[in-house]
Regions:
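Core catalytic region of metal-dependent phosphoesterases/phosphodiesterases
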Residues: 1-49
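Conserved beta-sheet core of the metallophosphoesterase superfamily
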Residues: 31-63, 69-165
């Protein structure tokens, strides 16, 4: 909210991930995730900000969205349903149009790659490692990825280190 005056337009989208299941992994329903509360809450709190849009883009399902950024299609996923590069082509098929980039969060660290001609941008976690990461010995520092986009796609990206929560 405090940054919105510095931008012409602020768009917020999110997908559900594997950290907010209400029941165990085996019994959880895809549509029963606490992530949905974030978008609902932000919509209510930000309704008076004319340049802030919550839920921008086209939602394929609760785990996938598509947004147009300066004429390029970006697909957002958490990543827990898409564990290998082979799934990139499946995502493009689901969208039904050429995809420029896939935005992913699942693995708790920043990374970029090009898979089957599609750029992949993986953003880290605000908190770094959680209990699951510790148990599986997956390392991740608190970090995020910022992409600067133009009509050609991603012009540059920045790794943003965050302060760990004590």
């Amino acid at each position: 909210a405090c940054l919105s005056p510095h931008f012409e337009k602020v768009s917020y989208v999110s997908v559900s991930g594997n950290h907010s299941r209400i029941d165990t992994k085996e019994r959880a329903l895809m549509q029963e995730r606490l992530d949905d509360l974030v978008e609902w809450y932000l919509s209510a709190r930000m309704q008076s900000f004319e340049n802030v849009e919550i839920g921008y883009g086209k939602r394929i399902d609760s785990s996938m969205y598509v947004v147009d950024v300066r004429g390029k299609l970006y697909v957002g996923i958490h990543g827990d349903y898409d564990p290998s590069p082979a799934h990139i082509q499946a995502l493009q098929t689901m969208v039904g149009a050429p995809v420029y980039a896939v935005l992913i969060g699942h693995k708790h660290h920043n990374a970029t790659d090009i898979v089957q001609g599609i750029r992949t941008i993986m953003a880290g976690s605000f908190m770094g490692m959680d209990d699951f990461c510790v148990q599986k010995r997956i390392f991740g520092k608190p970090e995020q990825m910022v992409c600067v986009c133009n009509s050609d796609g991603i012009d540059c990206f920045y790794d943003v280190a965050l302060c760990p929560v004590e």
